[in-house]
Amino acid sequence: MLQYDPNRYPKCTVPAAEIARVKGLGFLRDKRTADCFNCRVVTGNGKLSAEKLHAIADAAKQFASGEVALTSRMNVEVQGIPFENIEAFTAFLAEYGLEPGGTGPRVRPVVSCKGTACVFGLIDTYGLSEKIHYLYYKGYHNVKLPHKFKIAVGGCPNNCVKPDLNDIGIIGQWVPVANAEKCVGCGACVKTCPVDACHVEEGKYVRTTKDCNSCGRCVRACHVGALAYEHGYRVTLGGRWGKKVARGIALSHLFTSEEEVLALVEKAILLFRDQGVAGERFADTLARIGIENAEQILLSDELLNRKEEILAKAL
C-alpha cells in the first residue's frame, strides 16, 4: 500500500489568481515544476500546415522545455512554459495565426476525422469542421455555458473520431436507394455489407432499415448501378466520456445539407445555455428535459429567434 506524499511535486510559486487566469487562456499548470505551464495550441480541426508545425516546434524550443504532446482532441500541447514566458509565447504563435485555448465552460475545439481524404469518407469533414470552428468555437468563444461543450465531425459510420461521445456528433451518411429494375441479384452488396443489413430476395436487393448504418459500401459495390444514395448527416446529442459515460442519442431526422447541420449546432449550443444548469453536462440537460422535447425544439427556429435574449441572460 502506498501513502500519498503531498510534497512529491514542487509547490507552485505562481499566485492562485494567475493560475486561474492563464488556465482560462489555455495554459495548464505543469505539476512537475514550480512555475511552468503546458499550453494547448488550437489546431481548428486537427489539421495543420507544415509552416504552423514548424512555428509550434520553434515556440517549444524558444519559450518552453522543447517537449510537445498531442491532446485527445487533436490539438498540440507545448509543455514546460515558464510563467514569465506565457505572454511572449502567445505573441509568437499569433504571428503564425495560432492561438492557445480549449479550456473552460464554453465550446471546446472541434474534432474531425480525415473523411475528406479517407476512402470511407462520405462528407467533407475538413470543410464542415472548419466552418464549425470559425462559427462556434471562435464565434462563441466569449459565451459562457453551463459546462464544456464538445463537437466532433465523423466522415462515416466507422466513427473513428467517436462523434457519439461528444455533446454533439455529426456522422456522414449515404442512405441506399434501390432501383429494382436494374438489380440483377448478384449479391455483391450482401458480401460487402459490414452489418448484414441487406440480402437478395427473389433476385432483388432488400435492405433491413433498422440494421443499416448508411455507410454506403453497398452503393460502391454495385457494378450495375442499381443502388443510388441519399446524401446526408446523422446527428447525435448528449455524448460524453470520462468519469460518467454516455453515448449520444441520434436524432430521428436525417439532415441533407451543411446549412441545416450548421444551424442545428448553433441551436444545440443555445439550448444548452438556455436550459442547462451551471455545472451540468449537456447529457444531463437532455435527460432532464427529454430528448424528444429537445429534438422538437431543435427542429424549430425558436432558439434562433430568441438568440439575443438567451445570450444576454445570466447563468
Where do the model's predicted regions map?
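C-terminal, charged low-complexity interaction regions
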Residues: 293-315
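Short beta-strand elements
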Residues: 29, 168-172, 233-241
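A glycine-rich phosphate-binding loop feature that marks nucleotide/adenosyl-phosphate handling sites
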Residues: 150-157, 283-294
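Intrinsically disordered, low-complexity polar/charged tails and linkers
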Residues: 1-36
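Small-residue-enriched alpha-helical segments and adjacent helix-cap loops
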Residues: 9-15, 37-184, 188, 192, ...
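Iron-sulfur cluster-binding cysteine motifs and their immediate structural context
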Residues: 188-207, 213, 217-233
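Flexible, glycine/charged-enriched surface loops at secondary-structure junctions
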Residues: 65-72, 103-105, 142-148, 200-201, ...
